[in-house]
Amino acid sequence: TFISLPGRYSVLLPNNSSTGGVSKKISNPLDRKRLKKLHDNFNLPDGMSLIIRTNAISAEDEDIIADFSYLRKLWTKIREDTLKSKAPILIAELDTPIIKVARDFNQRTIEEIVFSDLKTMKLYKKLEKDFSVKANKKITHYKDKLPLFESYGIKNPINSLTEENIYL
């Protein structure tokens, strides 16, 4: 079975004996050298490989390391849960919307994230620790009666995406 665990800056291939490396799409020699050096310092065990993704070009090394650490912990948890479980059972959910937000949009440049649902906000805070080197943003629970999208003026632009009429 071919397993791949995607992170923001890397993809972990736990049952793959290839060496992995830096994405072929990264053509700048300085970027390739920096990322290759970082990749080689991960000391992957035999039978495991890692590919550094193109969006790692602009990332800080500590963020790439945090991404890799998260993927290693995730793989360890998946293996342990698999050994303890009786099939069929869901072992891990990797692409839920909240996981995608925490993994893909957890950037240093984002100043604030607003949640209308308290349960989702708490889950995000837990996930943020896995995906981020430092929590650098304001996380707010929106409590007003006016719906969140209306309050921020984004309801109409979103609704227009589903309109059947195209105005030229």
For the regions a language model picked out, list residue spans one by one.
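DE-rich acidic low-complexity regions and acidic surface loops
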Residues: 1-168
